């Protein structure tokens, strides 16, 4: 346990951070590193050697025998590592602690990049991991993890390269806008992200007995427990002692890695919890979230828990998401999404707000795709997560500001209201907007919050969002660049009004869960893309390809490869679920069902031989219900088997994914209905796997 007095010194103690670099690197090297981070694309060879030598020294001093890239996240969305030893043999048969400069900054050759690239490409393709300086090296499990980006042999981006490129492109255009508006001291604009990570904890022994959780991350069968989340007593409730101990250890491990974990609490569903960090620059936040999820699972294992990060591990209760708080900030400290005291006169705020509105409206299908997956599609559109229809909530105050913009009038602020209630001890003002949990993209004071994010993968898909915003800012720049002074002020008002009129259909402050909104959205022409296959044609549209290739974020080949990979991953996920479900029904559930029916039948026969009249009414009723469910289950199982076989023979990616979504998933839902009916009647002692009641309500 970290003592409170040592917390500040322990924070980042496993990181080769700026403080350490300043202490250990020669002054000229340290300055060169910072220059590279801020402006230059490459580090000089001599500087790279010095950095590598210092990394070697860190590894030696901290007894790290291996080094590896820090969990690069290739196209599967999963962590990838390749560990190499610092040890090198010498001519006299001994070994030396060797600097590995080429393995970090000059390129680390990886075998089989095609495993992450696409099965449609050359299977012998190799890949490289090249060093980057925007991230710090750190120590994990006895290895020194060195910051890299992963690319294929041909230079195609496979992980964070596209995010870094998009951030650079957005910054360039945003800086141009800020200087046009008179902010000459702005040299860089970054996006920031704070990701609220939801997760479930269950007993590890229960987890090991569930094939579906082990193989797919979610339960494929399971009758609901007698109690769910209807009492609303878990959200922000008192954290149970053993869970609190887990959270405490998790905080300490994250703090040592320099991850600013801040908030922890119980979530809505039983056994569901949340961890939230302080916001960071987008690329750092994405990497830290990837690392956080890995650490969460490892710490859970030490506490005899299993940490479930799937978006919908349990039917009938809320699933998990990643609530991403996203903003735009200058290097001079200006939050461009902060309305300030007078939002109607805050021109930078209005310009970037309008750019966001235009980007969300124009590229809604791509935003929907960024949160689409086989797991997350179970959650979106239900009364627990934002709908699949992309809209923006701006709150009451900003709605009035936008009305003034549209009318060409000055906005008159109503003033902040005071919070008052009986026995009030302090006076404070209300926020300028409430939170709307039914909106997929909600303004929350000085940022946008997106509740639709995946809980199981990091936020690496922010690259497209950055480019959508970059395109809209560039459009405004083109319209305004010829003006200055008072003419510029008037032209800004004109352009803002023009942009708002073109895109205001995407604004919606109401309840996104209602059928009325679905009807209204259709009238407005907003797309309702219910699953990943519905989104994919938009990804390879001419408009999308032009957006990403124009600034080198993706090549056309990279776009099409992602198209194939996303569809392939979607189909494979559902295919594995189908096979796992069939196995659990045939072996695990059927075994318990038959054993119980056999014992129940014997009991009925024995009682009828001893008793007169209408005895065994209860037992007969249960037996008949089991027999009926069993018969329907058999039919549904056969249909799922046949339809899965048909899907296995399909070759076209979109057609296959669409078939899995429309047919195989529907078969699984039908089969589950009868399986859950049967399970609800079978005593727990007959089942070889734990029930919902055991898993969700056993933590202490």
Swiss-Prot record:
Q: Which GO terms describe its biological process?
A: glutamine biosynthetic process
Task: Cite the binding residues for Mg(2+) 2.
Answer: 198, 267, 274
For this protein, the record's Pfam families field holds:
Gln-synt_C (PF00120), Gln-synt_C-ter (PF18318), GSIII_N (PF12437)
The main location class comes to: cytoplasm
Alphabetical keyword list: ATP-binding, Cytoplasm, Ligase, Magnesium, Metal-binding, Nucleotide-binding
Catalyzed chemical reaction(s): L-glutamate + NH4(+) + ATP = L-glutamine + ADP + phosphate + H(+)
What residue intervals traverse the membrane? none
Q: How is its activity regulated?
A: The activity of this enzyme is not controlled by adenylation.
A molecular function annotated in GO for this UniProt entry is: glutamine synthetase activity
| Necessary cofactors | Mg(2+)
Identify the PROSITE patterns for this entry. Answer: GLNA_ATP (PS00181), GS_BETA_GRASP (PS51986), GS_CATALYTIC (PS51987)
**SMART domains (alphabetical):** Gln-synt_C
Q: Return the cofactor note field.
A: Binds 2 Mg(2+) ions per subunit.
Q: Kindly state the subunit structure of this protein.
A: Homohexamer.
Q: What is this protein called?
A: Glutamine synthetase
- The species is Butyrivibrio fibrisolvens
Gene name, please?
A: glnA
């Amino acid at each position: 346990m970290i003592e409170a007095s040592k917390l500040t010194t322990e924070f980042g103690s496993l990181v080769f951070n700026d403080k350490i670099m300043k202490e250990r690197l020669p002054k000229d090297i340290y300055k060169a590193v910072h220059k590279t981070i801020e402006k230059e694309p490459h580090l000089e060879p001599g500087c790279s050697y010095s950095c590598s030598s210092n990394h070697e020294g860190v590894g030696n001093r901290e007894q790290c025998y291996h080094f590896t890239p820090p969990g690069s996240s290739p196209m599967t969305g999963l962590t990838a590592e390749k560990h190499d030893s610092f040890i090198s043999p010498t001519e006299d048969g001994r070994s030396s602690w060797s600097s590995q400069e080429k393995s970090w900054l000059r390129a680390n050759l990886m075998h089989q990049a095609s495993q992450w690239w696409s099965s449609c490409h050359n299977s012998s393709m190799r890949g490289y991991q090249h060093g980057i300086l925007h991230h710090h090296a750190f120590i994990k499990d006895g290895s020194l993890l060195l910051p890299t980006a992963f690319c294929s042999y041909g230079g195609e981006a496979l992980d964070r390269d596209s995010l870094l490129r998009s951030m650079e492109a957005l910054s360039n255009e945003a800086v141009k806008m800020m200087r046009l508006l008179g902010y000459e001291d702005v040299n860089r604009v970054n996006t920031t992200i704070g990701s609220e990570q939801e997760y479930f904890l269950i007993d590890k022994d229960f987890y090991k007995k569930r094939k579906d959780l082990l193989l797919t991350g979610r339960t494929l069968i399971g009758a609901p427990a007698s109690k769910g989340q209807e009492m609303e007593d878990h959200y922000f409730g008192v954290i149970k002692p053993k869970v609190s101990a887990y959270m405490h250890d998790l905080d300490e491990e994250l703090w040592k890695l320099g991850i600013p974990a801040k908030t922890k609490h119980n979530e809505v569903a039983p056994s569901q919890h949340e961890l939230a960090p302080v916001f960071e620059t987008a690329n750092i936040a994405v990497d830290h979230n990837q690392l956080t999820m890995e650490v969460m699972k490892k710490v859970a294992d030490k506490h005899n828990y299993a940490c479930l990060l799937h978006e919908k591990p349990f039917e009938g209760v809320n699933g998990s998401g990643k609530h991403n708080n996203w903003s735009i900030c200058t290097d001079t400290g200006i939050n461009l999404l902060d309305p300030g005291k007078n939002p109607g006169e805050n021109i930078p705020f209005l310009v970037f707000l309008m750019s966001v509105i235009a980007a969300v409206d124009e590229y809604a299908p791509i935003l929907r795709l960024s949160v689409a997956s086989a797991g997350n599609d179970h959650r979106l559109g239900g009364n627990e997560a934002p709908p699949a229809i992309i809209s923006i909530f701006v709150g009451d105050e900003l709605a009035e500001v936008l009305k003034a913009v549209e009318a060409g009038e000055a906005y008159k602020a109503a003033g902040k209201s005071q919070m008052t209630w009986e026995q009030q001890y302090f006076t404070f003002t209300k926020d300028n907007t409430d939170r709307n949990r039914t909106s997929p993209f909600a303004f929350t004071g000085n940022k946008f919050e997106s509740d639709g994010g995946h809980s199981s993968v990091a936020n690496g898909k922010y690259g497209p969002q950055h480019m959508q915003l970059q395109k809209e800012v560039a459009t405004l720049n083109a319209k305004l660049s010829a003006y200055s002074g008072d003419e510029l002020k008037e032209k800004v008002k004109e352009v803002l009004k023009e942009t708002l009129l073109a895109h205001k259909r995407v604004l919606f402050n109401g309840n996104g869960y209602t059928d009325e909104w679905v009807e209204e959205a259709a009238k407005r022409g907003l797309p309702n893309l219910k699953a990943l296959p519905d989104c994919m044609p938009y990804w390879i549209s001419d408009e999308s390809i032009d957006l990403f290739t124009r600034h080198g974020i993706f090549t056309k080949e990279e776009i099409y490869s992602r198209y194939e990979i996303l569809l392939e991953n979607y189909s494979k996920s559902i295919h594995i679920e189908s096979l796992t479900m069939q196995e659990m029904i045939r072996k695990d559930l059927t075994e318990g069902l038959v054993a119980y029916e056999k014992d129940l039948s014997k009991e009925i026969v024995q009682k009828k031989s001893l008793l007169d009249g209408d005895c065994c009414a209860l037992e007969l009723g249960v037996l008949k219900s089991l027999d009926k469910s069993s018969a329907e289950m058999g039919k549904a199982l056969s249909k799922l088997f046949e339809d899965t076989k048909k899907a296995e023979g399909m070759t076209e990616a979109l057609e296959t994914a669409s078939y899995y979504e429309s047919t195989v998933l529907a078969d699984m839902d039908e089969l589950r209905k009868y399986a859950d009916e049967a399970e609800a009647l079978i005593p727990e002692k007959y089942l070889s796997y734990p029930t919902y009641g055991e898993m969700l309500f056993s933590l202490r």
